Amino acid sequence: MKSKTKTRRKAREYAVQALYSWQISKNDIYDVINHFKKNKTINEIDQIYFYELIIGITKNLKYLDELMRPYLSRTIQELGQIEKAILRISFFELDKRYDIPFKVTINESIELAKLFGAKDSHKFINGVLDKASLKLRKNNSNKN
């Protein structure tokens, strides 16, 4: 049996890919999820967490984009699609999942950027999340 850490990491990887596909194609998110269920080894991931990320992000998209806006050096529209997907996952975790330490969210996001992003996107992601995590988790410290 795989560890929760590994299956959750894989769920984040799949979530980046699913969000990227959704952002590019504009297909219904449930169609994207069904495509992943057919074409990926979905049993090797934390499926519940994958669904929570995808559904939670798409249902709270405007809120999450607005939440990240003050920490960006450019507009959301100017972000690359991969960076946008990673940041949406990160801000979802920072805002909704207080059981996940913010340092874990930052580390996982950096690793996702190294895996999927442009050459230096991990540095951009790290800078955004360093600023945001201090503010977001401080403002919600009663939830930590």
Curated annotation (Swiss-Prot):
This is Transcription antitermination protein NusB. Transmembrane segments: none annotated. NCBIfam families: nusB (TIGR01951). InterPro entries: NusB-like_sf, NusB_fam, NusB_RsmB_TIM44. It comes from the Bacteria. HAMAP family: NusB. Keywords: RNA-binding, Transcription, Transcription antitermination, Transcription regulation. Involved in transcription antitermination. Required for transcription of ribosomal RNA (rRNA) genes. Binds specifically to the boxA antiterminator sequence of the ribosomal RNA (rrn) operons. One of its GO terms (cellular component) is cytosol. GO terms for molecular function: RNA binding. Pfam families: NusB. Gene3D superfamilies: NusB-like. Belongs to the NusB family. GO terms for biological process: DNA-templated transcription termination; transcription antitermination. It comes from Buchnera aphidicola subsp. Baizongia pistaciae (strain Bp).
